[in-house]
Amino acid sequence: SKLEDVAKALKDQGYKAILVEGHTDSRGRAKKNEELSFQRADSVRSYLVSRGITAEKIKATGIGPSRPVATNDTAEGRANNRRVELVVTPE
């Protein structure tokens, strides 16, 4: 899986800190999107920790719909906006 590959690369290359950012599309209520984006990020964080990433060095945060990478006017754009991004601070 992609996340398995990410975990392996992080362990191989090292890291000082990792921020897992969850994102949503703009549909639905703002509060629900914030919660969903955090749940999405926290799920990835938990998986990476289960694969050997140091829990104290990885944090999850929910961004909600505030930073889209595509339009929210199409199904494809909304799908692209429902994502998780990793911000890695190297050692």
Where are these regions (language model features)?
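Periplasmic OmpA-like peptidoglycan-binding domain that tethers envelope proteins to the cell wall
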Residues: 8-91
